[in-house]
Amino acid sequence: MARAVGIDLGTTNSVVSVLEGGEPTVITNAEGARTTPSVVAFAKNGEVLVGEVAKRQAVTNVDRTVRSVKRHMGTDWKINLDGKDFNPQQMSAFILQKLKRDAEAYLGEKVTDAVITVPAYFNDSERQATKEAGEIAGLNVLRIVNEPTAAALAYGLDKDDQTILVFDLGGGTFDVSLLEIGDGVVEVKATNGDNHLGGDDWDQRVVDYLVQQFKAGHGVDLAKDKMALQRLREAAEKAKIELSSSTETSINLPYITASAEGPLHLDEKLTRAQFQQLTADLLERCKTPFHNVIKDAGINLSEIDHVVLVGGSTRMPAVAELVKELTGGQDANKGVNPDEVVAIGAALQAGVLKGEVKDVLLLDVTPLSLGIETKGGIMTKLIERNTTIPTKRSEIFTTAEDNQPSVQIQVYQGEREIAAYNKKLGMFELTGLPPAPRGVPQIEVAFDIDANGIMHVTAKDLGTGKEQKMTVTGGSSLPKDEVDRMRQEAEQYADEDHRRREAAETRNQGEQLVYQTEKFLKDNEDKVPGEVKTEVEASIEELKAALKGESAEGDNTAEIRTATEKVAAVSQKLGQAMYADAQAAQAAGGAEGAAGGEHAKAADDDVVDAEIVDEDRKDGAA
């Protein structure tokens, strides 16, 4: 049987792991290291270099070296080299091929299957791109797994019931997840993150600082010199790492550039305090996803049993201190290597899928709510955010107009109550509905999300059996900034959304009452006394006028509500008048017939029957 590996395809570094005798082992690469830089370069002779060798030659081959390609996954980014365009999938495939070769050399056999990890907040197009990269590299991608989930799997497989917080700050992405572990089940309770926050951003702040200092001292802008910038990036990364263990570092780059006077050298000192000051706002950005996860999971900080730090960037003292502060003074677990834990978890999941690891269940979640637009522009959620996947949910909807021939199903993703403020994922139409009064047809809308997060939507007319399907290949296809916007707006405009929802619901109730009352008047024309009919019709006209007054977004909700209540109150007179007539008719019939105890009893029985009919009628109309 072909071996399956677990791959952590990182922004700055990648790791591959395999199960040996049921235990995960991190594979050493051809250069003897356990991590491989996620760098691809094209040598002048056309040879493709990957990993450490690509990183080493980057300074002298800037234009033909690609790094941090993970940040471009799922986009239309391209690089043209030697007259050929390369996309992110192809670049990532070069890295995956290198990891595959190293694994095959280590194991002495072919490797065809892999579980590849992605940030928890990766959208569907980014996940699809990662899967495609694996396929281009010649791998059968068994599953795309979220990085924090894989980390928890590696950490907690042998643990009793525990609640674990995974704080994952890598080279280019940031995720926080809260998971519950016990009896071989790893269940994600909530997840949040930022797809554009990572160690690269900390490096960039140091680069910007060095450029600024050099310009102030020498009047030369290094930002315009690609080769100098590459040297600065490498020096910045080295300085960042050194400042994790010491309080001061020297950045010395001789012959960084030249001016009319001759060669210029860069020599700067950077203290840990300066570094933390330069990057304070980046650290601040880590707080919101953390608070969102705690809020979404609905737990207290005291309920967190362990904190697991993942990603090389968590080695920065300021990050470790922030996590301790956020978790109420809890020390992070030191028993896991932040660089390797994700790949180990991926190898375990590969073992689960191949049947090598028994009695383990991994339950992941969808990061945002999914639903459809219903009357009044309301977002009706079928699947709430942080719902365990795979999942299937369905709900019965009906038509809003008489003899409606079709219904349009518009699928949205987000947290706002008004559909238009959420992300539209797709739309399709269910046609061929038979003519029927509004509210009669029954249309079942079903959402089905598979284990890879790809969503399928089905609409079925239960009357005719007609069905329409759509696959939303963007089950989570939202850029992180858009997710942030939705979340922030959901909080800022909660009151406004509530008002609009209330207005739409009040309007819907009013329209429904007009429809029902007019239908009742028409069906019982000969039984309703003239003066009662006139009064009811007048109140209906008032309600119609109120409904026409403004749109659902207007501020005449109170007016509509008052008119609706008036119609409801006046409508009661219809029933009273009809039953009064019925009783009078019964009484008259009893008097004309042979008067007797039996007839009187029968008349009483008829009255009782009328009450039961009334109950049924009310239930039917509800």
UniProtKB/Swiss-Prot annotation:
GO molecular function, one term: ATP-dependent protein folding chaperone
Superkingdom per UniProt: Bacteria
Secretion signal span: none
Positions with biased composition (Basic and acidic residues): 491-505
Keyword entries, A-Z: ATP-binding, Chaperone, Nucleotide-binding, Phosphoprotein, Stress response
Keyword Lipoprotein: no
Record's compositionally biased regions (Acidic residues): 605-614
Keyword Nucleotide-binding (UniProt): yes
SUPFAM superfamilies recorded: Actin-like ATPase domain, Heat shock protein 70kD (HSP70), C-terminal subdomain, Heat shock protein 70kD (HSP70), peptide-binding domain
Chain positions found as Phosphothreonine: T173
Induction: By stress conditions e.g. heat shock.
PROSITE patterns assigned to the protein according to its UniProt record, in alphabetical order: HSP70_1 (PS00297), HSP70_2 (PS00329), HSP70_3 (PS01036)
Residue segments, region Disordered: 465-484, 491-511, 589-622
Listed NCBIfam families: PRK00290.1, prok_dnaK
Role noted for this protein: Acts as a chaperone.
Family membership noted in the UniProt record: Belongs to the heat shock protein 70 family.
Annotated protein name in UniProt: Chaperone protein dnaK1
Gene field: dnaK1
